[in-house]
Amino acid sequence: MKTGTHTPAGPGQVLPFPGRGADQIGFERPELMRILDLYGRMVAAGEWRDYAMDFTRQAATFAAFRRAAERPQARIEKCPALRNKQGMWTLFGEHGQVLKRGHDLANVLAPMERRLLKAVEE
């Protein structure tokens, strides 16, 4: 027996390598494009003027403001931990109430799309 060549799993077996989890959650390009498209149309309608994004280990958040000094009028949150439960997307209203949850970003943004149509009609 040779010293220093100990292989606990045996030759030819692959051992799992303990990796680190993601440092932060982010938006994928198509998701961000969809959100920014809505944001641009809301700016053109005069509803929103500013936005902020926050990326943490648990969630990615996009918040839209009428004025920078106010609380956000809408907040879109991506939380992958909820993917298999109620859906990883959540739309929050101005007072923090949940307006919509779901698995599909387009469906979650639907209340804001309807609000945009009302703003354009006025």
Regions found by a protein language model. Name each.
Residues 64-69, 92-96:
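Secondary-structure transition/turn motif
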Residues 50-56, 73-84:
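Short linear motifs in intrinsically disordered
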Residues 1-3:
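Contiguous mid-protein beta-loop-alpha structural module that forms a pocket-lining wall or clamp
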Residues 9-12, 20, 76-96:
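Short aromatic-glycine-(Arg/Gly/Cys) micro-motifs in beta-strand/loop hairpins
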Residues 40-45, 66-72:
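Short, solvent-exposed secondary-structure boundary motifs
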Residues 5-61:
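Negatively charged, low-complexity tracts enriched in Asp/Glu with abundant Ser/Thr
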Residues 72-80, 98-105:
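Short amphipathic beta-strand/extended segments with alternating polar/hydrophobic composition
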Residues 90-120:
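Mixed-charge, glycine-accented linear interaction segment located at domain edges/termini
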